[in-house]
């Protein structure tokens, strides 16, 4: 018998997360490590769990994630986006509450490029009057 699983891809900044939802008891595995082991900060764990808590599905699915690129915050956002998309494939009725919370929207904010003549994207070199 084929195993029921739902896939979702999430992106945020430079991070890309491939998420797989499998019916289970609510374990979250990121790059073959537990969520507690992967994300040291509690706030990042909360971000990842948001779609599951919102839709009351946090004990129904095991979440298997493969994520690469970017930093911790970007990865947490990408995982949240991927979980939301996978939940949508599992149950289309969740669209309204996920959309209302903004979890289905790809955050378009990216790092601004550095310009020549400046130290960073907007930081100008120190000005000296004399």
Swiss-Prot record:
Keyword Ribonucleoprotein: yes
Alphabetized UniProt keyword annotations: Ribonucleoprotein, Ribosomal protein
Intrachain S-S bonds: none
Region entry Disordered, spans: 109-130
Pfam families on file: Ribosomal_S9
Composition bias, Basic residues: 111-130
GO term, biological process aspect, one: translation
GO cellular component terms given for this protein: cytosolic small ribosomal subunit
Family annotation (SUPFAM superfamilies): Ribosomal protein S5 domain 2-like (SSF54211)
One Gene Ontology term of the molecular function aspect: RNA binding
Highest taxon, organism lineage: Bacteria
InterPro entries linked: Ribosomal_Su5_D2-typ_SF, Ribosomal_uS9, Ribosomal_uS9_bac/plastid, Ribosomal_uS9_CS, Ribsml_uS5_D2-typ_fold_subgr
UniProt cross-references to NCBIfam families, sorted A to Z: PRK00132.1 (NF001099)
Family of the protein in this entry: Belongs to the universal ribosomal protein uS9 family.
UniProt cross-references to HAMAP family, sorted A to Z: Ribosomal_uS9_B
Protein known as: Small ribosomal subunit protein uS9
Organism: Clostridium kluyveri (strain ATCC 8527 / DSM 555 / NBRC 12016 / NCIMB 10680 / K1)
Lineage: Bacteria, Bacillati, Bacillota, Clostridia, Eubacteriales
Record gene name: rpsI
